[in-house]
Amino acid sequence: LMAGKSLQDESQRRRNGIKVLTEKFKRFGYQVLMHEDLCWFDSRGSFLSPTYKKEVKPSSEELKHIFEKYKQATNPHLDSVGLSFLSCEILLDLGILNPFEVENSHSSLCWDGRTLSEYLLFYARRFLSLTERNPEVAPALIYTHLNTAHETSGKRIRFDDSHLSKFLEEMARSRTTITILLSTHGGKTTNYALETFPGSLEVYSPIMFIIVPDKVAQRLGKDRMDALRLNQKRLVTVEDLHGMLISVGEMTDSPSAAISETSGLFRPVSATRTCADIKGLYSDAMCRCQGWNKFLSPKSLDVI
């Protein structure tokens, strides 16, 4: 998504290409805000700074010494990390360092009557609202990263439902902002996911949908919008989404600006594309064929 290509290699280093996307949008004149629900000094590391990964004791002298190293390792093209540091404070207050291994009593990650996800979503919406009201302020690219589906009890997903629904309802009323909801997988660490067949199907059921306001659709033009509608029924990748984002950043005020080969989802994806055509697909990825959700008898001739 961030780099527009797979960064997997033999080194297995944790890379996400975040600097590729943010540097481009800074050149396009955007302000960039990215925040997450992970804590930067946890052993699992941080999405915002994948090259920095070191666990230290909170509030220790060692923490003070390594904070400067963390800031140097963090993406220089970010204008703001939003509430990422608040994530650390909330997790520490609950006696944990990450949302992956929480006790059931803290599984909703609730702090002062609100969940951690609610804080991040509210901040993103508030930031966008202030940006939209002031025509003199640079447009914004905002990325909010939530690890909801990694919690073991399943409570956090249920708690986040209402907050995410409210956020999307508010974004649907925006006149100038394209909103993209994207997941990499369904809940995968709950007993439901691990022990039931329907739960195992959810693990491999990521979602993606895009909210395009009427005003933005007019600027994009008929060809781009037609391609978006068509591609809802095509095999698409996050690389296509990356191309779409870059195309938005490059757009002039003219909706008739050329649609290039790298325009991603703004160009019709081939109806004959298969998983074999996708470069850099991870070996543990599951590609579904048409009719995957139909149950077959073991004696069926369709079973090999």
How should each PLM-predicted stretch be described?
Residues 14, 23, 30, 270-304:
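Exoplasmic/lumenal regions adjacent to the first transmembrane segment
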Residues 49-53, 159, 172-177, 181-224, ...:
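Histidine-centered active-site microenvironments of extracellular/periplasmic hydrolases
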Residues 216, 222-257:
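Non-catalytic, well-ordered alpha-helical segments in soluble enzyme domains
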Residues 29, 36-39, 146-150, 183-187, ...:
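Short, flexible loop/turn elements at secondary-structure junctions
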Residues 1-155, 205, 262-263:
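Active-site-proximal alpha/beta segments of enzymes that process anionic O-linked groups
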Residues 128, 132, 180, 245-253:
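Short, hydrophobic alpha-helical segments
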Residues 1, 25, 139-146, 157-160, ...:
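Beta-strand elements within well-structured catalytic alpha/beta cores of enzymes
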Residues 108, 167, 171-175:
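Fold-level signal for large, globular catalytic cores of enzyme and receptor domains
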